[in-house]
Amino acid sequence: MTYSIVNDAAVERNVAPWEISRVPSEGVIFFDAPTQSITPQGLMPFTFEHGATWYQVDEARDNRKINADGTGLYAYANDGLLFVKRFDDLGPTCPAPQEAEIQVYVNAGKTYIELEAQGAYTSLKPGEVLSWTSRWYLLPQDTDNTPSQVLADLVGTVVK
């Protein structure tokens, strides 16, 4: 899916593409990033296993949102499916202020989780266009939705 941001204003604007996918508040989320790249630290229980950082949905009932500097992909496994998103990897200075390439938001009511991907923060002159692509993959999987090499390897079959 390719998005375009068009600056129709008469002045220069700073923008960053941002895509949110809402998923059920269950299952497991994982992405390629060291746990120390997650901010704020300690807000959600992430572990590093099988070459990825994992968040298995927990019982906490607070609004929580983390930022992470990943490698341009994240995955979510639940209910027999694996959802993978691939997008441009950002350098550490590319995200918008106070933002990150990967964001995970869990709402207090535990009714959904937002998986967010963000592109580079850039300046658009009047009339300029920014295009940004996010590729989605949906695969069957038969794990118990816990961190596993099987899930990590399955992502590798579509993201090379």
Report each predicted region and the residues it spans.
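Hydrophobic residues positioned within well-ordered beta-strands of beta-sheet architectures
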Residues: 1, 113, 132-134
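Short, hydrophobic/aromatic alpha-helical segments in well-folded domains
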Residues: 1-4, 16
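A contiguous, surface-exposed recognition patch within enzymatic or periplasmic domains that forms
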Residues: 8-130, 141-153
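Acidic, Ser/Thr-rich low-complexity intrinsically disordered segments
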Residues: 157-160
